[in-house]
Amino acid sequence: MAKATTIKIKLLSTADTGFFYVTTKNSRTMTDKMTKTKYDPVARKHVEFKEAKIK
């Protein structure tokens, strides 16, 4: 079987609340680290989320 092109990643909050989203990305087209602005319900505001490895 061929290697999958999409991988699961964890988007970790930069507000240091420990909250994270799990999403997928195409590792062939998006080689750099992903950052997104999303809602953090613990901090109760929109913050930047950065990519981290799922353990």
Curated annotation (Swiss-Prot):
Molecular function in Gene Ontology: structural constituent of ribosome
Presence of the UniProt keyword Zinc in the record: no
UniProtKB keywords: Ribonucleoprotein, Ribosomal protein
A biological-process GO annotation: translation
Gene Ontology cellular component annotations, sorted alphabetically: cytosolic large ribosomal subunit
Listed Pfam families: Ribosomal_L33
InterPro entries linked: Ribosomal_bL33, Ribosomal_bL33_CS, Ribosomal_bL33_sf, Ribosomal_zn-bd
Origin superkingdom: Bacteria
HAMAP family linked to this entry: Ribosomal_bL33
Similarity comment: family membership: Belongs to the bacterial ribosomal protein bL33 family.
Protein name: Large ribosomal subunit protein bL33
Species this protein is from: Sinorhizobium medicae (strain WSM419)
Lineage: Bacteria, Pseudomonadati, Pseudomonadota, Alphaproteobacteria, Hyphomicrobiales
